[in-house]
Structures are given as structure tokens and as C-alpha cells.
């Protein structure tokens, strides 16, 4: 099929949209976040008791978060290149999973299901307000981009170095991470809600499928 008309027509689906639009490839990272959340009701439910000691729980959670961040820096952050000019702190799907997982773990460990829904909606609202009313909707002018540039500075992926030793932000790199972490947490929580439905509906799998299809 390589080189066929169908392949040529559809291959653009296996890359991210430059800015506006949507492609199949844009589903990959959210799907990983969602699957992470779907497993959490099964793994965290045993810790939701009044007498639980949360320190060992958080120690395991933080260990996973740190490992995912390190692996992310190895995969895409150029950590093993040992070149300080090309090391990026927050630039990878693994790191977005780490942050989303941590946010969702805190919510699930300490809040009832009703409050989990409310907090998830509040996270979306907290993301939406500055994105709508601060900055603009251009790649370089949106609020999330400005936060990344301010917090990460030259350790942001997409930075390029000039011959005189100065650095600049690339106009071709439009991915945002710091402020978008709120939505990473939301996506993991959506997976957790789906996982809760599956966990509590094991006796009637047909109904579980119907509910999941109904809510999308």
C-alpha cells in the first residue's frame, strides 16, 4: 500500500496538526492519559480508608512520577546527550502522564466521587478562563505558551541557539505543557470515571458497555 493513492491521502493523519485542526495522531497522547486514569480506581481503591497511612502511598506515587519524568527527559529531553543547551525539562508524553497521574491520584485519594466530578470541572474552568481572556489564540500569543516561556525559559523544548550564543524561542514549536497540565489531570480523571464504571459494573458487562458508549 505504500505509495498508493490512499496512503498518500491519509498519511498526514499520522502527524500533528500545525495549529488549527485535528488529526488522528492528536488522539495518541490523550488516549495514554485516559488509559492511565482507567486503571486507577482498581489500584487506589484499597487506600481509601480512614485509617490509611498516606505516606507509603505517596512515596510510591512520587516514585512513579519521578521515573516517568526522567524517562521523558531521556526520550525527548536529550538528558543523555549531556549538552546543557539541548536539555529540556518538560517536553514529553511520559511527563504529561506523570503530572496527570499525580493530579488524579490526589483527587481520588482525598475526595468523594461527587467532589471528584466537581474538581474535574473546576480544573477545566481554571484552564479555560485565562486561555480565553488573557493573551490570544495565536501559537505565540496564547496564555499557555506565555506560561511555558516564562517558567521553562531556555529549558523549553523548541528553543534554538544562535551563533552568538544567545537563544530564541522557535516559532515552529507550538506544544504547551505547564498550563496544559490542568487538562492532563482532567483527561486522566475522565479515564478514572470510566474505570470506576467498569469496576462497579463487572457483574453486568453489557450495561457497562452501554453506559460508556452513551457518555462517549
Predicted features and spans:
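Membrane-water interface regions at transmembrane-helix termini and the short interhelical loops
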Residues: 45-49, 80-82, 99-116, 126, ...
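Hydrophobic cores of alpha-helical transmembrane segments in multi-pass inner/ER membrane proteins
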Residues: 29-39, 97-109, 183-195
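Short, small-residue-biased leader/transition segments that mark boundaries at the very start
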Residues: 1-8
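Long hydrophobic alpha-helical segments that form multi-pass transmembrane helix bundles
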Residues: 113-186
Amino acid at each position: 500500500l505504500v505509495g498508493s493513492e490512499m496512503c498518500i491521502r491519509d498519511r498526514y493523519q499520522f502527524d500533528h496538526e500545525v495549529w488549527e485542526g485535528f488529526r488522528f495522531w492528536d488522539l495518541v497522547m490523550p488516549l495514554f492519559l485516559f488509559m492511565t486514569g482507567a486503571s486507577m480506581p482498581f489500584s487506589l481503591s484499597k487506600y481509601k480508608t480512614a485509617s490509611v497511612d498516606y505516606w507509603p502511598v505517596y512515596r510510591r506515587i512520587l516514585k512513579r512520577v519521578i521515573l516517568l519524568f526522567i524517562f521523558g527527559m531521556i526520550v525527548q529531553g536529550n538528558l543523555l546527550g549531556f549538552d546543557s543547551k539541548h536539555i529540556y525539562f518538560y517536553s514529553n508524553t511520559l511527563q504529561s502522564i506523570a503530572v496527570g497521574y499525580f493530579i488524579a491520584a490526589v483527587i481520588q485519594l482525598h475526595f468523594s466521587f461527587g467532589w471528584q466530578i466537581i474538581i474535574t470541572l473546576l480544573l477545566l474552568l481554571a484552564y479555560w478562563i485565562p486561555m480565553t481572556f488573557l493573551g490570544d489564540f495565536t501559537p505565540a500569543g496564547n496564555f499557555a505558551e506565555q506560561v511555558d516561556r516564562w517558567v521553562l525559559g531556555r529549558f523549553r523544548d523548541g528553543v534554538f541557539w544562535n551563533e552568538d550564543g544567545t537563544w530564541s524561542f522557535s516559532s515552529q514549536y507550538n506544544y504547551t505543557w505547564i498550563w496544559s497540565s490542568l487538562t492532563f489531570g482532567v483527561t486522566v480523571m475522565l479515564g478514572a470515571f470510566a474505570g470506576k464504571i467498569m469496576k462497579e459494573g463487572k457483574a453486568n458487562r453489557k450495561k457497562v458497555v452501554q453506559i460508556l458508549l452513551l457518555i462517549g
